[in-house]
Design a protein with these regions (language model features):
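Extended alpha-solenoid helical-repeat scaffolds
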Residues: 1-691
């Protein structure tokens, strides 16, 4: 009996050790998901799939991390192979019910699994899940019965259902609709009743995801790819969908989730409405009245602090130029408010104003594209008509002279039409640019123009307007308005840079960094001289700000939007950051940069100088960074040239640490230069100037 007990104990001890080994292996196998070797990636996926069958808890982490492989680039068989294998794995894990299930039970099982994939998912994971479901829907892997079950979960009213499940259902349905908009078109009433009705008002996240699903009714370029016949007619502003979308932005609440709802509701309005600017003008006017009517009731007699902020009585025009009546007292800048409601209301108003401004410039761009598309179609039709006319004319009897005259006349007409067409298109583009640059924020009939000075004042006087949420909303609004007009951008750029440098709120600093990145794309000539301020945020004490800055700079540099001067060393420091995500991002950046015209080689000396001069970097960290960077210098010619440049520094080194740094880098380079080897072998010489 004792022997049996001992063996049992040993068995369980070994089993526990085995479980620990499997759990410890999970992070390592997660890393293999990012391997360049296709077979390693596929085997890692298989490991997580098999482990899930044995209910190994840690494998759920790997299964979720697998999702990002849906973005594996590949026109090659290798890239497609990884993507296809991922879809097959997920199909077996979540989309295949046991054989014993009836069709109804199987549909319930799959719908439940799909909903569970949204639980606790990060925004990045949801984006990857959307792409996965998009591809699966395109390949016909999602049965109609499963979609019907998802609508049942979302629309159920008689029995209690958890918020998570209802949200999960509409998230998944919105994702499937990227491949097939008909999924949501047929259930608009359900969405208005649930997501934009009482349930949505009680659960703002449900309302947000309902707005996203509604937006899918109008297919984007991705959804209309490969000759899809899906067409969408935009809705008039009195349509029930648009009325409900406008109403959901006006729900009285102090819940921070309201901002997500308002953003997606405005996105949906701009996707679905024939005249979104008119409807959004109404939303802004009503919100302005609500906010400033409350302010004037509390402080009826206090004058406004700045004359230039006042609006002419009874004239606060709309985005589209139609006048509206808003008393001047309501639109004057707010004074110090003790009322929490006023501050919340103003924060929400500024958020709406900023987001509408951004959506309006996107809307103008779409109008321009639509105009050009229709004009091209019209020109093609005219060309066809002329061609058929020419063919019928040439078939008639007539002398060669007459025919040539007709051809000359036709060619002349074609040239004239081309000239007129070109001018018309250019005129339209010029008009759009003028509206964006001069009308939206400076036009006498523009509603947004009333808010530009107010936002600047709130941001500039953060000691007066102390509320954290108000400052966050105002900075975001300022940044979005700056993306509309280069004139407004130039006037407020010093203010935004000051906010980015000095704001005590990391969220505000992060938003300012993203905004500067956007402006570098919109108005490159203004931002190019100020990129140093952006690089400084890489040394921000908050990891969130540092990470945001690194991602922003990665995009700008790789897309060629900013010129790299001598600041890449700041990004190289991030390779040794305490935050693993920042270090991984930096590695990814340099790996991508190395594919662009010897960029690492060209900037290595500048990076080396900056790193070597920074006494805060210890020797081991410095060596790891240099070893990583020199791994991208592969050509012998480049190695020799770098070695010569670095060797010239040996004689100028003032400290032994500096000399060691140079010697270490030279040791990594395959230069095959005996003179350099001799210099290094002699070691560091302390040269003292005579007294």
């Amino acid at each position: 009996a004792i022997e049996k007990l001992t063996l049992t104990k040993r068995y369980y001890t070994e089993a526990l050790k085995f479980i620990d080994v499997l759990h410890e292996a999970t992070p390592v196998i997660c890393q293999l998901l990012g391997s360049k070797n296709k077979s390693e990636v596929i085997e890692a996926m298989d490991y997580f799939e098999i482990g899930d069958a044995y209910n190994i808890e840690q494998n759920k982490i790997g299964i979720r991390k697998m999702l990002r492989l849906i973005w594996t680039k590949g026109s090659s068989d290798e890239g497609k192979g990884v993507q296809t294998h991922l879809i097959e794995c997920y199909k077996r894990l979540f989309f295949e019910a046991p054989d014993s299930f009836s069709p109804n039970d199987a549909a319930n099982y799959i719908a439940r699994n799909m909903i569970s994939l949204t639980f606790g998912a990060t925004p990045a994971e949801l984006t990857s899940l959307e792409q996965l479901l998009h591809l699966m829907m395109k390949q016909g892997m999602i049965p109609d019965l499963v979609i019907a079950k998802l609508w049942q979960v979302y629309g159920v009213q008689r029995r209690e259902i958890s918020k998570k499940q209802r949200r999960g259902a509409i998230i998944v349905l919105g994702m499937l609709a990227t491949a097939s908009p008909e999924i949501v078109v047929g259930e608009m009433e359900t969405m208005l009743r649930i997501g934009l009705g009482a349930h949505g008002r009680a659960d703002l996240q449900l309302a947000k995801y309902t707005c996203i699903a509604l937006r899918r009714i109008n297919p984007t370029s991705r959804q209309t790819e490969k000759g899809s016949t899906t067409t969408f007619s935009r809705l008039s502003n009195d349509h029930a969908v648009l009325v409900k979308l406008a109403a959901i932005t006006e729900v009285p609440t102090d819940n921070k989730e309201w901002y997500g709802v308002a953003e997606q509701a405005i996105n949906a309005i701009y996707a679905l409405s024939k005249h979104p600017d008119v409807l959004c003008s109404e939303i802004i006017r009503r919100k302005t009245r609500a906010v400033f009517a409350r302010s004037t009731q509390q402080e009826p007699s206090r004058p406004s602090s700045r004359d230039e902020m006042q609006i002419e009585p009874s004239q606060a025009p709309t985005l589209d130029g139609a006048d509206s009546t808003v008393p001047a007292s309501q639109a004057s800048p707010i004074k110090r408010q003790n009322s929490k409601e006023s501050v919340i209301g103003l924060s929400q108003l500024l958020f709406i104003v900023g987001h509408v401004a951004i959506k309006q410039i996107v809307h103008l761009e779409l109008c321009e594209l639509d105009f050009k598309r229709r004009k091209q179609e019209k020109d093609k039709e005219k060309a066809k008509d002329r061609h058929s006319l020419g063919a019928s004319t040439s078939s008639r009897r007539g002398g060669g002279q007459n025919k040539s005259k007709q051809q000359q006349q036709q060619e002349q007409e074609d040239n004239e039409l081309d000239m007129i067409g070109g001018t018309t298109e250019d005129d339209f583009t010029e008009a759009m640019a003028h509206i964006r640059e001069r009308e939206l924020l400076f036009g006498p009939q523009s509603l947004l123009a009333q808010f530009g000075p107010m936002v600047s004042e709130i941001c500039a006087n953060n000691t007066v307007y102390k509320d954290r949420n108000l400052q966050q909303a105002a900075t975001l609004c300022l940044a979005k308005l700056m993306c509309v007009s280069s004139e407004y951008c130039e006037a407020n750029l010093p203010l935004l840079i000051t906010i980015m440098e000095r704001s005590p709120d990391p969220t505000v600093r992060s938003n300012a960094v993203i905004a500067l990145g956007d402006m570098a794309v919109c108005f490159n000539h203004l931002i190019d001289e100020n990129t140093d301020f952006l690089y400084r945020r890489l040394a921000d004490p908050q990891p969130m700000v540092k990470r945001t800055c690194l991602m922003t700079l990665t995009f700008l540099i790789l897309a060629g939007q900013v010129k790299v001067k001598g600041q890449l060393g700041e990004m190289a420091k991030c390779l040794e950051d305490e935050d693993k995500r920042i270090a991984d991002l930096a590695r990814m950046f340099f790996t991508e940069l190395s594919t662009k015209d010897n960029a690492v080689y060209n900037h290595f000396v500048d990076m080396f100088s900056l790193l070597s001069a920074d006494e805060r970097i210890d020797e081991e960290a410095f060596r790891r960074i240099v070893r990583f960077l020199l791994g991208f210098v592969e050509k012998d010619k480049h190695a020799k040239q770098l070695a010569e440049k670095l060797a010239a520094r040996l004689a100028r080194c003032e400290t032994e640490r500096q000399w060691n740094d140079v010697a270490f880098a030279l040791g990594l380079l395959q230069h095959k230069n005996e003179e350099i080897n001799k210099l290094v072998a002699e070691g560091f010489k302390m040269v003292q100037a005579p007294a």
